[in-house]
Amino acid sequence: MKILVTGSSGKLGSVTVNRLKDFGYQVLGADIMASITTDVIADVTNKLQMLDITRGMDAVIHTAALHGRHMDLNYSREDFIQTNINGTLNLLNACVANGVKKFLFTSTTSIYGKSLVDDNQAVWVDENLAVQPRDIYDITKQTCEELCREFFVKEGLQATVYRVGRFLPEPDQLMLNHRLYRGLDERDGAEAVRLALDYNFAQFEILNVSSGSVFQKEDLIALKHDAQRVIMKYYPAAAELYQANNWKFPQSIDRVYSSDKCRRVLGYQPKYTFEYMLNQFSQGNSE
């Protein structure tokens, strides 16, 4: 199976390239920046390049994008639209033109935007939560999701969307805290899209992909107002590690990302969870 991975020099894209190669896929990595996981320098805004590099492919995993950090670098709205929306459309059209069967689009949990705010309790974030974009990044991702839906319905392209959780470089304490409720290890993200390559979707699907959480809906009020008490209920052994490192538990947790649908549909089982990382740190290891 021949797979094109865009954004192959990025954090998720590079790990995805290596993960797929480990499973015997023929992978072509494409990015505007050179790296060991990038085979061809290509720009998603270039229609002819996208037509060329999708030729002969069985699937495209599209991770290339401008992200939230690019807003801090003063990229314009036009830049976001050109790269994220027009670039995605170029790839979708190229897939149809070249008979590519599958298109896997990495979106973001940031797209829930204003729906993530509740003064009374943590928000349960599954795919039924309303999308309420807060900025140009969210807006472009929402538009791309709808383009994927359009191509699934009208062109017969097996386009699916993966709203991935947070996987930014972070200090150990912050990374560990985020794994409790909103984080994602890019290795788990790569595994989710690998599983999707072998799944035949009968309808258009959007799937949240995160490290998962042991928290339940009945914990939501307490998580908002006394998160440490809830954490101790599930992970009493964490107290020793946090105290030894002078780390602080979050006092309030504002959301819980649910990947239950991804588990149910694809059999997704994240490995690099809070519990896994807790054990690694407790044994003196870090990844």
Identify what each model region corresponds to:
Residues I36, V44-T83:
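NAD(P)H-binding glycine-rich loop region in Rossmannoid oxidoreductase-like domains
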Residues E191-E287:
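C-terminal substrate-binding subdomain of Rossmann-fold SDR/epimerase-dehydratase oxidoreductases
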Residues N90-Q132:
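Conserved Rossmann-fold NAD(P)-dependent oxidoreductase catalytic core, especially the SDR/UDP-sugar
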Residues Q82, N86, V117-A159:
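Catalytic helix-loop patch of NAD(P)-dependent Rossmann-fold dehydrogenases
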Residues Q142, K154-L157, P169-R179, E186, ...:
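Glycine/proline-rich active-site loop of Rossmann-fold NAD(P)-dependent oxidoreductases
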Residues T6, A30, V60-A64, F103-T109, ...:
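SDR active-site strand-loop-helix element
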Residues V60, N74-F103:
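NAD(P)-cofactor binding segment of oxidoreductase domains
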Residues I3-F23:
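N-terminal Rossmann NAD(P)H-binding glycine-rich loop of SDR-like oxidoreductase domains
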